[in-house]
Amino acid sequence: MATSLLLRHSSAVFFSQSSFFTKNKSFRSFTSIKMEKGEAENAVKTKKVFVAGATGQTGKRIVEQLLSRGFAVKAGVRDVEKAKTSFKDDPSLQIVRADVTEGPDKLAEVIGDDSQAVICATGFRPGFDIFTPWKVDNFGTVNLVDACRKQGVEKFVLVSSILVNGAAMGQILNPAYLFLNLFGLTLVAKLQAEKYIKKSGINYTIVRPGGLKNDPPTGNVVMEPEDTLYEGSISRDLVAEVAVEALLQEESSFKVVEIVARAEAPKRSYKDLFASVKGQ
């Protein structure tokens, strides 16, 4: 079951006068600023969140949740015309062509100087090119991080996967770990990208979900430190929610979090969930 669910995984403020990322590695979240509701919404829309992999099953949900919460969004896609059929018209949504494999310079131009945060929800689709996972999940993510640094982006959120470090966890014979790595060592590629992010200096949150489900959310989010979970599943809707909350909660800074959903888990605020995980 875990194998089939993980196979479907496609790897996909606070906008105030202050910055997410400062010299002491801290940022002031949008929710910490005392504003009237209308003022807060206007403040959010002064900057954009760039979403890479915006038409993927998880990326699309991230875009929709950002828009529903009043964010302005720049959706990075490989086929703009096709993407236009995936989203409803929204004055806060800008669809732009972006291919993470084309290098950081082009990506920096697309991200622009009006994107204050970037969420990466890219992921390869199984095909004949066994190097695709490395082109997208490793080098593509690295390109995106370098582009963010060029543009001074203040927050980077990566949607990754549990079991990326399965070998070190003693899970090398885990069926899901074996199966996903059949496709060009996908999890190994993701892990290398994570290592680069940690050394980049950018304020990051790496979200590692369990097996992804397209069903409506059930249960409550369980959040654990990196290299803890080796089974379990979670709705893509909840993954998108966690990715957005990573922008809003200062407790998410410089952390790798693993998430699944469990019916028996208590309901906890995202502030508490992120605070419960030790950072870098």
Curated annotation (Swiss-Prot):
GO CC terms of this entry: chloroplast; chloroplast envelope; chloroplast thylakoid; chloroplast thylakoid membrane; endoplasmic reticulum; plastoglobule
SUPFAM superfamilies linked: NAD(P)-binding Rossmann-fold domains
Keywords carried by this UniProt record: Chloroplast, Plastid, Transit peptide
InterPro entries according to UniProt: NAD(P)-bd_dom (IPR016040), NAD(P)-bd_dom_sf (IPR036291)
Localization terms from the record: Plastid, Chloroplast, Plastoglobule
Transit peptide: 1-51
Family membership noted in the UniProt record: Belongs to the NAD(P)-dependent epimerase/dehydratase family.
PANTHER family given in the database record: FLAVIN REDUCTASE-RELATED, OS06G0360300 PROTEIN
UniProt protein name: Uncharacterized protein At2g34460, chloroplastic
Species assigned in the record: Arabidopsis thaliana (Mouse-ear cress)
Organism lineage: Eukaryota, Viridiplantae, Streptophyta, Embryophyta, Tracheophyta
